[in-house]
Design a protein with these regions (language model features):
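Conserved S-adenosyl-L-methionine
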Residues: 184-185, 423-432
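Short, polar/flexible loop-turn hinges at active-site or ligand-entry regions and domain interfaces
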Residues: 83-92, 107-109, 160-167, 300-302, ...
Length: 525
């Protein structure tokens, strides 16, 4: 991960910009630079992953134009080969192709990128700024306006709090130019429904996911894998292990009392022959880390915070004890193939609508969690299930095939990898809520801690002062109060609490955990 920031007009207060930008130096601890473009400021904190030499340091410059980009551009070598006919390059960085690409294609370039990215371009010829974000929002970007009405962009909301009145997430799949946000890609939209037979669909799913993992193994820095023992991360690890000439490094975490995941993660690690590490977390670590995790995340969402506790502590351990710089994770599978609660979808049409909603909101929930937990520990997250070709294909598959009519959720994904990729019991293991999987006790400790902080009268009184996404439990109130401490008045960055679709029968619940659903069954065992 890297961190970027831009002030898009002259007369910027350099010291204020620098102070705001320092808040995300952990995203890019290798080098930092702020430049004056003549009409504003651009900042870059570098975490070197591709092109590790100083020549790969940003901003990149081309005839008075500049770019800063937090991104990974897959297959950039082919684009670079074509651009070499007209341009010279000084580094091995994938992001150096961006300015030549912009000169050749303008904002049409964004449709051409197979990438996860957030970028800011200063067009020196037109004296204006362009910003853009990848179609899913895997790389973070926020914007706001200062007192003079000047727009600012930054990798995280914390960079802009205090400098801008109202901070909002930059919409994924959009670019900003001439005061307008323009959508260049709606990754959740379906151009044409795919009616291939089951075996063809599963063959395509298998091939496209393998390709998505493959391209994310390319790095000049060392790569590791988060392995929960659940279906999604286990598949990523199994695919990578087949592609690697030496054992991959896998990491799992769980509570000391009742970690469900650790035994399954070890079973997978033994099966694929990985160099595996288990990290144990305690009640004290969870409670002591809570405020820092919420400050890091920039959210009050219950499930995002719960699921971040283990991920943050695991990534912290990896940062402090290894030389790994890149981590592959299993996010974005549920949004595509279904959660436990989508078993209750009343129709294929409703299943598809819910999937589209979840994909379009990913940048506020699971993707945000993975980015912050990993990047705050000076690591880079890569998400194979977020591969654009893979997502586009799965979204196009007839939703009737994706619904759970097989007696097992996410059947297409499971069936696609039947064979010897994973042990059968792992491949067909019931999904466990992540907060359950690291240990039932973790969520119980968080709830217990919150319960002890407020009387019933205090709880009711404190909840009343919030109008947007009003807290409804003592746990949610605690998270909101910590959020407001660091992001005062910025709650609209998050549209609402992540919850199952309450309009569906069986889903009208008041806790985001799948544990409260009637179909959870054996999932948490």
């Amino acid at each position: 991960m890297c961190s970027i920031m831009g002030y898009c007009d002259c007369c910027a207060a350099f010291s204020d910009f620098e102070e705001g930008f320092k808040k995300t130096v952990s995203r890019g601890p290798d080098d930092s630079r702020i430049i004056d473009t003549g009409k504003g400021l651009l900042g870059f904190h570098r975490l070197a992953i591709m092109g590790l030499t100083p020549d790969g340091m940003q901003p990149f410059e081309l005839d008075g134009s500049y770019v800063v980009c937090n991104g990974e551009i897959y297959g950039y070598e082919k684009i670079k080969e074509e651009l070499l006919k007209k341009y010279t390059f000084k580094s091995g960085s994938d992001c150096e192709i961006l300015l030549p690409l912009y000169r050749e294609y303008g904002t049409d370039m964004f449709k051409m990128l197979d990438a996860e990215f957030a970028l800011i371009i200063y067009d020196g010829e037109e004296k204006k700024y362009i910003a853009a974000r990848d179609p899913i929002g895997i790389r973070p970007l926020y914007y706001g306006y200062d007192k003079k009405g000047v727009i600012m962009f930054a990798s995280e909301a914390k960079n802009l709090v205090g400098m801008c009145g109202h901070v909002m997430p930059f919409p994924p799949g959009h670019y900003y130019k001439d005061g307008e946000f323009v959508q260049y890609c709606d990754i959740a939209a379906v151009d044409e429904v795919c009616h291939d037979d089951l075996e063809t669909v599963c063959k395509n799913i298998r091939e496209k996911l393998i390709a998505g993992v493959d391209k994310r193994l390319v790095a000049d820095a060392k790569v590791g894998f988060l392995l929960s023992g659940g279906l999604d991360s286990s598949l990523v690890c199994a695919i990578a292990a087949r592609q690697s000439k030496k054992p991959i490094r896998t990491f799992a975490i769980g509570m000391s009392e009742d970690a469900i995941d650790l035994k399954y993660a070890k079973e997978v690690a033994d099966y694929i022959g990985s160099d595996h590490t288990e990290v144990i977390m305690t009640k004290e670590q969870v409670i002591d880390s809570l405020e820092g995790v919420i400050r890091m995340l920039g959210t009050f969402d219950i499930t995002t915070i719960r699921a971040s506790m283990g991920m943050y502590l695991l990534c912290k351990w990896i940062h402090e004890n290894t030389d790994i710089r890149v981590l592959l994770t299993g996010e974005i599978s549920d949004e595509l193939f279904g959660y436990k609660y989508t078993d209750f979808a009343p129709s294929a049409e409703e299943f598809q609508k819910e999937s589209q909603k979840r994909i379009r909101e990913l940048h506020m929930y699971d993707v945000l969690r993975a980015d912050r937990c990993i990047s705050v520990n000076s690591l880079e997250a890569r998400v194979p299930f977020g591969d654009l070709d893979f997502v586009k294909y799965v979204m196009s598959v007839d939703p009737a095939k994706k619904m759970n009519t097989y007696g097992k959720g996410k059947y297409l994904l499971r069936h696609a990898f039947e064979g010897d990729y994973l042990p059968h019991d792992i491949l067909f293991r019931e999904k466990a809520a992540f907060s359950d999987a690291v240990g039932h006790s973790m969520v119980d400790y968080l709830k217990e801690y919150a319960e002890g902080l407020y009387t019933e009268d205090e709880f009711k009184e404190k909840c009343e002062k919030y109008t947007h996404a009003k807290p409804f439990t003592k746990e949610s109130l605690l998270y909101r109060e910590i959020f407001e401490k660091y992001y005062p008045g910025q709650s609209e960055m998050i549209v609402d609490f992540w919850m199952p679709n309450k309009s569906w029968e069986g889903c009208d619940v008041n806790d985001p955990s799948a544990r409260v659903l009637s179909n959870y069954g054996e999932s948490g065992k």
